[in-house]
Amino acid sequence: MRRLCLFLLALFCCTNTYADAPRTFREAKKVAWTLYADRPVDFYCGCSFKGNRIDLRSCGYVPRKQPKRAARVEWEHIVPAWVIGHQRQCWQQGGRKQCTAKDPVFSLAEADLHNLVPVVGEVNGDRSNFGFGMLSEKPSQYGACPFVVNFKQRTAMRPSTVAAPSPAPICT
């Protein structure tokens, strides 16, 4: 009986030590800050950051149009939330905001920590929901940052040092 009690106690203690995955994008961003605390470097440009402030000089970043947004860290979905959700019924009825509020499957996909990385805010905004592809432009839009956005083609080109994204998850 004593062994059974000890076993059950150990089992209970062990299962409580594992954290649940974040259920919302807001929760995921909080967890992501702790994940990147040991290596506070932006994903696309290699800029260092402290708190939510990007050190633009650390990577030679030059703002294209939005210096205030360029100076802050934002959490980028490598596979855009639009790709994950635009075919879902909730998106048809009110876009991302509706899906975040009403669709727990979308919320979990939006909160996937494997799909979130810290980036320069301006780059996040400029990339929007554009897919990745090869572009002929030389990387100069953002100073020394090797990220390129072609707004007419609705395409972004990631630096060659950044791994390609996995296919978008299928949400049912």
Ranges and model annotations:
Residues Y61-E74, I78-T172:
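Domain-level detector of nuclease and nuclease-like folds
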Residues A10-L11, Y36, A111:
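Sterically constrained small-residue positions within well-ordered secondary structures
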Residues L6, A19, K50, V83, ...:
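Residue-level marker of positions within ordered structural domains that often coincide
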Residues L4-F12:
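Sec-dependent N-terminal signal peptides
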Residues C14-N16:
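N-terminal signal peptide c-region/cleavage motif recognized by signal peptidases
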Residues D20-R72:
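Aromatic-lined ligand-binding clefts that engage carbohydrates, nucleic acids, or primary amines
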